[in-house]
Amino acid sequence: NVIAKYDPSISQLLHISSYCVIYQYDEDIEDWTKSSYMGPIAVYSRRSIWDNYRDDDIKKLDVQTIVNSEHGEYYRFGLLVLNRAQPENFSLGFLGDKYLKQSEIESDQNLLVEKSDELIIVRDFNGKAFGLWIFDPKDRDYLYQLLMYCIEKLE
């Protein structure tokens, strides 16, 4: 599995699309800027620290603990764009609100996934906004629904 080369914690491949372009929101110009990341995109579940807990035993975390984790052991899901333009790939980890302290959710520190006409918008735990452009609208809609599931906005 190619993804395991980049993330050895992969558990199961959930979705793959043949082509995605990553945009990053530039607050200075208040517009999207095309990045150099483009290629096949994969969404997958990962083995994580949470595999050892029952739902009612989950210890709530602050965002800095998650962001500062050395190997991403807290993320339940991953997204990876295998970059065709350069050797460096684009990746994001996903974790639902139920793992976060309530204060982090109330201060808007949680992950955010939205959909515009052309982009799936993801705000990570660092507050950076990325736009995922997928050519096929049906594939884009499916990926949006899957990412919403990954952050537990859909059951």
Feature-to-residue mapping (PLM):
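Boundary segments of small protein-protein interaction reader/adaptor domains
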Residues: N1-K128, I134-D139, Q145-L154
